[in-house]
Amino acid sequence: MSYVEKTLKALRSYRKISEWNHFAKEFEEVYEGAKELGNDEVEQVRALSDRYFSRVRGEVNKDDLNEEELEAFTKLEEVMNKIKYEEL
């Protein structure tokens, strides 16, 4: 299974806020693996993660999150920013 396929699988799996910590960890692992395969895989993972997180960010009101959910959201945001902005 390619890293892009793994990314898509992860995106479909983690819909609940309570699962975001696990999702962030898994997504970071997918990204690190994609870096080993080259720029094409990385760019595909970046595009998918950016689309996903843009949607999540638009749907989530941070004021409505409890402490655990806010922590999970912040971790996911950190991982997504790393994927989006890290220079290779």
Give short role names for the model-derived ranges:
Residues 12-15, 19, 37, 61-71:
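Non-transmembrane, amphipathic alpha-helical segments
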Residues 24-29, 43-47, 66-74:
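Short, charged, amphipathic alpha-helical segments
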Residues 1, 7-10, 15, 41, ...:
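Coiled-coil-like amphipathic alpha-helices with heptad-repeat character
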Residues 7-10, 36, 47, 64, ...:
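Acidic/proline-rich low-complexity IDRs
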Residues 34-65:
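Acidic, low-complexity, intrinsically disordered interaction modules
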Residues 54-88:
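Amphipathic alpha-helical binding modules
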Residues 1-29, 77, 82:
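Short terminal alpha-helical segments
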